[in-house]
A protein has these predicted regions:
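Residue-level recognition of well-ordered beta-strand positions that form the cores
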Residues: 11, 32-36, 96-98, 111-113
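Extended beta-sheet lipid-handling architectures
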Residues: 5-7, 80, 95
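Histidine-centered catalytic/metal-coordination loop motif
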Residues: 23-86, 115
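Conserved small/polar residues in nucleotide/adenosyl-binding loops
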Residues: 117-119
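Short, well-ordered secondary-structure micro-motifs
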Residues: 18, 44-46, 105-108
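C-terminal structural segments of small proteins and small subunits
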Residues: 85-107
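N-terminal presequence-like segments and the immediate start of the first folded domain
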Residues: 1-26
Length: 119
């Protein structure tokens, strides 16, 4: 069974990029997360302790983005994926990071999928 816990449009103003202006001026960074979990234990116990705490995860992702002052979106997205997979409930994660103001006429970003399950 694979259920999905998702966080969409998590928006943080942060330093991200290699251009001189990107190193000085924070820009919006938008993150979407989809974490594969098995929600049966939480459904049966009705205990919050048996769930993935998405509020806590959102705070951790925001802190990572702001404190990291990343040069490359590739480094950031892999660090976010590793953070998500450190949650014991998560068996896989899709992460999308967008820089909506990087180009005047388009939204750019990167999407990755990582899994703890090896087939």
């Amino acid at each position: 069974m694979s259920d999905i816990v998702f966080i969409e449009q998590l928006t943080v103003n942060a330093i991200l990029g290699i251009l001189p202006e990107e190193r000085i001026t924070p820009q919006p960074v938008v993150v979407d997360l989809q974490l594969q979990v098995d929600s049966r234990a939480a459904a049966q116990s009705t205990r919050i302790e048996d769930t993935l705490d998405y509020a806590d995860l959102a705070i951790k992702v925001q802190t990572l983005i702001i404190d990291g002052k990343y040069l490359l979106i590739e480094t950031l997205i892999n660090d976010i994926a590793d953070l998500c997979l450190s949650a014991p409930e998560a068996s896989g994660v899709t992460v999308e990071v967008r820089k909506p103001k990087a180009l005047a006429n388009a939204i750019v970003g990167l999407r990755i999928y990582l899994s703890l399950i090896h087939i």
